[in-house]
Amino acid sequence: MKMSNMLISTLREVPAEAEIDSHKLMLRSGMIRKMASGIYNYMPLGLKALKKVEDIIREEMNEAGAQEFLASAMIPAELWQSSGRWDAYGAEMFRVKDRNERDFCLGPTHEEVFTDIAKNEIKSYKQLPVNLYQIQTKYRDERRPRFGVMRSREFVMKDAYSFDKDQQGLDLSYNKMYEAYVKIFNRCGLDAKCVEADSGAIGGSNSAEFMVKSEVGEDDIVFCTECNYAANIEKATARLEEAEKEELIEVEKVSTPDSRGIDEVSEFLNISSKKTVKTLLYNVDGKIVAVFVRGDREVNEVKVANASNASGDIEMASHEEYMNATGCGIGFAGPIGIKADLILVDKEVKNMCNFVTGANETGYHIKNVNYGRDFEGTIGDYRNVVEGEACPTCGGKLTISRGTEVGHIFKLGTKYSEAMDAKFIAENGKEAPFIMGCYGIGVTRTMASIIEQHNDENGIVWPLAVAPYHVSVIAVNVKDEEQVKIATKLYEDLKSMGVEALLDDRNERAGVKFKDSEIMGIPMRITVGKKIVDGEVEFKLRIGDMEVVKIEDVCQMVKGEFDKNNLKLR
């Protein structure tokens, strides 16, 4: 591509709206332009980079035996209603009506569509396994779009769905996708780590996320410093401390006027917050759920929602619901005598002795409460882990980092096939539901994450495999016919080798051309200037020192970079 013919407009200043490196650099390099909140146009340079990521994904998916197709982005409500998710998905779904008042949505995800296709097209176990995928634009009405394409309302996603006849088949399909994802992110030059995750609105049993560490990430990721344990904070657990061994003491109600919070109660009673248990009340599908965790812990609402079999988001109980359940003011609720439809007790509480809780009476708490003797409930893990706790696998130290999700794989099982009556004829001649898996990659988010991990003060530093262009050939003075002639010859030679090259033949100062090449992140630069009188040009990697080389050798130097990166020229 000759830059004199290219639609490109780089920015020297950082746009005020941009908060993170990828957003700043995608705007400054001319990759994207904002259309509306969370909605972007992909300019030629941005689209070319996006297609590079898509091509890698497509190659690895095809290699893993998946078949590409393209589903409709507009989905009739009936499909979502058949799975029970039309109401459960929530406000993020863009819902529309046609002229006949029929309900549709712009697909935020495509489980129902793929399941419906399998239901109609796959009749026998002899046709299984099948893995279908698409690369398509998705739509989600994010409450707060931010960070450019990292969290936008319109984004490109690769979603794949496997259909198997049994659990063993699903395990094989899941493992194939895991291996494909590892290859995809490695080829993209992205340092992504697979972590245990919650299935969220997608549902199903097992799931894992591919996360990239990022200071601006929206998820907390828990890692063990000693072993390979890693999990999203929504899923992470810690090794349970040994049970306290104390002689049980009779309960005692004590006056705690104006002491509502854990810190206030602990100070008033001169005890550690670790000797208290706090109460949180939730409304889950119209039922009141009481959750009890140690006073210094934070409730994990995802774990609570899963334990409560919530159909959607859960919310804190209203003041009226709180009063009906406890009969007291805020800050004085406790487990003894509470009126709740479901009582969830964190397993850590079960191991505590003689702790303090609210008395369900305003101005009072109860000392020396013990689980089993004084109250009971459903024991489980309902809290967030904290930095420094013991790893559940090896006992090592847990550490927490911020991260961004770029991929997610699920074992759906029969969640959708049973709900939508999607069945096949099994080997025994009877109908059976498909055993499904779901595998997603955020393509636009992956591209932005690559930029987050590969940049410097001068701009993007694209890995060679995903760079929109491999080489920038710069004619320093376009009024010098010999410079233009040699630059054009090198440009054509590189193209004939399969190298994607830019010829900067613009009538601009050399400094402008160099800065544009750097901010765009082009991995290699060949500068054709005054040294051509000696048969030489300058060769420079995006990060590296400039070398003066013979004109006849420079194309082989470019090829050598492909060899170093184990990349084939097309």
UniProtKB/Swiss-Prot annotation:
Q: Which InterPro entries match?
A: aa-tRNA-synt_IIb, aa-tRNA-synth_II, aa-tRNA-synth_II/BPL/LPL, Anticodon-bd, Anticodon-bd_dom_sf, Pro-tRNA-ligase_IIa, Pro-tRNA-synth_IIa_bac-type, Pro-tRNA-Synthase_IIa_type1
Which GO molecular function terms does the record list? Answer: aminoacyl-tRNA deacylase activity; ATP binding; catalytic activity, acting on a protein; proline-tRNA ligase activity; transferase activity
* Enzyme category, top tier: ligase
Query: Mind listing the UniProt keywords for this protein, alphabetically?
Result: Aminoacyl-tRNA synthetase, ATP-binding, Cytoplasm, Ligase, Nucleotide-binding, Protein biosynthesis
Identify the EC number(s).
6.1.1.15
**Which proteins does it associate with, and in what oligomeric form?**
Homodimer.
User: What family does the entry list?
Assistant: Belongs to the class-II aminoacyl-tRNA synthetase family. ProS type 1 subfamily.
Q: Any notes on this protein's domains?
A: Consists of three domains: the N-terminal catalytic domain, the editing domain and the C-terminal anticodon-binding domain.
Q: What is this protein called?
A: Proline--tRNA ligase
Q: Which organism is it from?
A: Clostridium botulinum (strain Eklund 17B / Type B)
